[in-house]
Amino acid sequence: MVRDKASGALVPADMETFKAYMPELFAGEIQVDIEAFTPLIDSSDIGPQIWEQVARMVVSHYDEYDGFVVLHGTDTMSYSASALSFMLENLSKPVVFTGSQLPVGVLRSDAKENLLTAIEIAAAKDEDGNAIVPEVTIYFEDRL
């Protein structure tokens, strides 16, 4: 979410705007690719149809990535993560949900810390090359 300059209301941030606020996403050792839903959806409007779309996206790209991060609003994040944990059983890769209490453009936003750590968790492997957290999780406010 970002604040609309004209109205002052919070609106979903398109990926280009999001990238502009977080250039460090693409400056690290971890390759980050972004897939966005169109139109962007407020988390209060998310339900079974969207859960299915997220699950299908993970399944369709499962062999291409070491892990997945789902940016999600806080209203229904726990419901979505729970639903996906049942839809994506027996994972060998992480699917990490995260979001923020404050929009990415706000000075003290927790968005950067939450997202960067979620990406690190999604990419983390043990000494044998296996995912450290091979399940659906939520990373939020310094807690996994």
Regions of interest found by a model, annotated:
Residues 1-144:
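Active-site histidine-anchored catalytic micro-motif
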